[in-house]
Amino acid sequence: MTTSPAESRPQLIDFKGRPRVVVTGVGAVTPLGRTARDFWKGLVDGESGIGPMTLCDTTDYPTKIAGEIPDFNPRERLDARDARRMSRFSQIAVTGGLMAIEDAGLDLESEDPSRLGIVLGNGCGGFPDIENGGRTVETRGGMRLSPFFFPMILPNMATSQVSRVLGLKGFTNTVTTSCAAGTQGVGDALEVIRRGAADVMVSGGTEAGISQLGLGGFSVMKALSTSNEDPTKASRPFDAKRDGFVPAEGAGILILEKLEHALDRGANILCEVTGYGVSSDAFHMVQPDDEGEGAARAMAWAIEDANLKPDEIDYVNAHGTSTPLNDSVETRAIKKVFGEAAYKVAISSTKSMIGHALGGAGGMESVACVMTIVDGVMHPTINYEYPDPECDLDYVPNEARRQAVRKVLSNSFGFGGQNACLVFETYEG
């Protein structure tokens, strides 16, 4: 007996009756490389993208290292006029967006632009241009500012510029929830498709805030690593000798599609996004809730939203910032959610190799989660050398681990107690 096409077509809605959503393309501009594939290869190989800071003068600051994008030239993808009118965080977002659209094989001219949308996360906007603008006002006066100064620095301009370049005329938003923003960029885009407001969403996060403003602000908070002697060893999440995060920049972009739309155009489906959870600590401006209650809620809600149980998760891409407080609190939160299964699930931190790119971090980590499922390999947490009794789980230390990975949880926890988590799964039709 033959099966009709209608009978063989995959289920198009999830257990709550919402449209299923899949990932069909990724793009990344990162300290480990300017493409998603180079980024992923560096992660699997356990390379570090952290080195001496070159984007600003570090003379007066205790931290002199960063995760900077190597040899980034915006004119590889943008014309000269566009490049001049964009801040760096917008340039890398547009570059990543163009790559993601190409990876997805989307012919935008054949799509209804009102059904194409975008949500990007960003934390700092155009910090370097704000700093330079302040110098101009101080030395030459405010009337010597560029007429593009104000539109260049606004956090929503990356979203706006990607929309303009790609012709996205549907739902648009910018998420500014600090270190959780990139993950919320993906999660909020997921919800737009689930409620029927779009067929395709460009999603993720971008950040390029390396500047004296950022360096000084984080330094006086004592949030940054000062292990300048060997930059590649400075970011060491969950390690007993961790001393703060390493500032970084980068963008990670995912193309999310309604499953039905992806099938109709014969898209190559990389994986499925099945769960999203968001919570607030309501606790402190910069410190996480000591017991990880807010982080645990976001994880539990994301897993529940995916119709899973915690012990079904194969791998956790941790927030893992390399700060003394975050890593121990995140470990406690994982134990609250997973119970005894916490000691069996594999966990690793992308930030061990690229540093912390704030609003761009969750976008790059989401790309890493997609590639984890596609390639069946979990990248390591590098620089894990000295066990911390408060961080006693399996952090995939120092070497990648190859095994089938079907269900992944990604964590992002931002300043102000903003928590966001995503679940990615193997697409099985």
Can you describe what each PLM-predicted range is?
Residues 2, 58, 62-68, 125-129, ...:
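Active-site-adjacent elements of ketosynthase-type condensing enzymes
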Residues 2-82, 104, 260-270, 367-382, ...:
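ACP-dependent fatty acid/polyketide chain-elongation machinery
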Residues 2-23, 110-113, 306-312, 343, ...:
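Flexible, low-complexity linker/loop segments at domain and module junctions
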Residues 20-24, 51, 229-306, 315, ...:
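Condensing-enzyme catalytic core mediating Claisen C-C bond formation in acyl metabolism
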Residues 23, 38-39, 44-177, 206-217, ...:
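Conserved beta-ketoacyl condensing-enzyme motif
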Residues 37-44, 127-142, 192-195, 215-228, ...:
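A glycine- and small-aliphatic-rich helix-loop capping segment at beta-alpha/alpha-beta transitions
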Residues 93-107, 155-158, 163-207, 245-267, ...:
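Active-site-proximal alpha-helical scaffold in enzymes
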Residues 139-146, 184-187, 191, 200, ...:
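Glycine-/small-residue-rich "gating" segment that lines the acyl/pantetheine channel
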